[in-house]
């Protein structure tokens, strides 16, 4: 019985952690997926955005109690506007995607949705972390030494 309890505690302590990209690995992946220069946004800005939104973690989520929405994945894409989690009141789902798809280690769906986000008038300014940490700053460090 004691062994079962210990095993249960061990299993409870295991957290699901998605892929956490290395900076240059992410830069190369985003370039391959067509984000470098997309809508005039440099690759360095995309990598900066991902750093400050999720710490490059594909499984990152953040609940927003105000509107009962959740931000998902490497770009922290919001369930109120962009994806469907089946829980957010009045969700729009402009990317026509399940929010869970934004948590995959393969970030192709997240990139496709991010491209949809920046086609809106706010562009990359839709992300608060980009405005706070990347906008009007030298972001070249985010791709420096990556060969991209």
UniProtKB/Swiss-Prot annotation:
Belongs to the glycosyl hydrolase 22 family. Disulfide bonds join 24-146, 48-134, 83-99, 95-113. Monomer. It is an enzyme of class 3 (hydrolase). It comes from the Eukaryota. The active site is at residues 53, 71. It comes from Chlorocebus aethiops. Lysozyme C is capable of both hydrolysis and transglycosylation; it also shows a slight esterase activity. It acts rapidly on both peptide-substituted and unsubstituted peptidoglycan, and slowly on chitin oligosaccharides. Its EC number is 3.2.1.17. Residues 1-18 form the signal peptide. One of its GO terms (biological process) is defense response to Gram-positive bacterium. This is Lysozyme C.
